């Protein structure tokens, strides 16, 4: 007998991390919230993007007006084509049950293919790994570029730029454990002020040099690329700094919804960014020396200190969005079987998406501070930026093609015609950024490569371990038949055996029979599955199957953005007729001690890496939120 759970009020869908359910939140609040969370990264790019791009274009050392016009034109059209057309118009439609992001896109693409699913997973691993490189560089570069504005007030601040940056970043990571719910409400209004200020500040230089508006014509961008050869190609790597953060539009789709994100971009963010880049360009055309720091030099001297303060707050907000994204991506990766279980703490009782992962927080803090101390300036660090983001964009375009073809059911020619121009542009930007590998671009590549190795090793090792365990374990159906024919001594209560393979007898059950030679009155084989969707409807959470008078199978399904809570999910099973009492129930878990084998299917070094990752995994009792007083752990040794 198989029974599906009915929806119950006790198991309401979880709300998202940064806002209430869309049905209760106003459109204006969601739009304002998206300005604060989604656009922090791309919104702080004017601090350094144009400066670095014009510097790259000025091979002779002088910022020639035609070069400045060409760079501005490239930036404006990158914002229009990459951000507006690719993300705002097309990719925001490719949602996985309302959620976005590369792993959500990977899960969506997997559902549409029967062959080649492993390639989709590999693309997802590459994209996810590269994001961590971005998550390390963004806080370091953003905060450093804001603090550098103090040098324009007085040169005496110069020696304190790096220490101040480190202090601010350390404070930012230190408060993560307390959650950001109380201050997150201010992110939107602060970033709205930021966008209004940087847009308005551009008017005086534009009015003094209105010819800069001619940069809106794409002919300037094309002419610049045609006449500058390799210099133009190198400049593209710096131009891309203006669109870093575009992935956040798609990644935060589930938090705010498509229309609020689109509205914020088209009516607030894009106009402000375009005006600011035009204003900086006009300033450099008027005075080539302004290239030193055109963003802050647009403001009068009396406004420098307030602007440095506002820029610092804006960059902290941008950094917070990336840090939160790293937590969210890690939870998704754990649920999708790409990383071992980490300790996940919920920082809000109201919003399940507001989480804190101590191990990730420590690794990010150490990496970010190391980058600041290593590169010391935003100009040096800008060389390291871009590769991870362009790599992610290339992968997103590839998976987007699969979704449009297989899920939306377009013809391959039509899907290719739509995606090919964006993929070509992304590959061009990636090629330009690869020229910066020796200057610092190796940093995100090294970080991404390390995380990619971890993800690939964990997935491959887990699969090999599963296959080996299935060969060694006894079929569950045969064991149940034997126990029904010759039942051992019964003890009162319910035993729940947690297993990843519902077809095989759990190791904990076999050890219980071998050592205690008793069987509980009721025995449940519990399997926890991760669905290829962000969240699971309560009506699909539990599947209960009676396989004999004393044995039943229970399958709990969770989305890849949910944190599994076994007791809460089992409460649904009670409503299906299962007489479940937590105080008379024992949970049996097997803890494996892994040893490398001579022929495991993986290289020796990968065996040892997998074993190390397995040992560092968070305890299943804590991860699945099972009451520790009701748990019995059985140790087993397995060779892989």
From Swiss-Prot:
Catalyzed reaction equations: K(+)(in) + H(+)(in) = K(+)(out) + H(+)(out)
Main location per the UniProt record: membrane
Location(s) in or outside the cell: Cell inner membrane
Sequence intervals crossing the membrane: 30-50, 71-91, 117-137, 155-175, 183-203, 224-244, 265-285, 294-314, 363-383, 385-405, 410-430, 437-457
Source organism, top-level taxon: Bacteria
Alphabetical list of Pfam families matching this protein: K_trans, K_trans_C
Keywords associated with the record: Cell inner membrane, Cell membrane, Ion transport, Membrane, Potassium, Potassium transport, Symport, Transmembrane, Transmembrane helix, Transport
GO cellular component: plasma membrane
Transmembrane helix keyword on record: yes
Membrane topology: Multi-pass membrane protein
Region annotation Disordered: where it falls in the sequence: 1-20
The keyword Cell membrane is assigned to this record: yes
Biased composition (Low complexity): 1-15
Example of a GO MF term: symporter activity
Function in brief: Transport of potassium into the cell. Likely operates as a K(+):H(+) symporter.
Family membership noted in the UniProt record: Belongs to the HAK/KUP transporter (TC 2.A.72) family.
Name recorded for this polypeptide: Probable potassium transport system protein Kup 3
Species this protein is from: Bradyrhizobium sp. (strain BTAi1 / ATCC BAA-1182)
Lineage, uppermost ranks: Bacteria, Pseudomonadati, Pseudomonadota, Alphaproteobacteria, Hyphomicrobiales
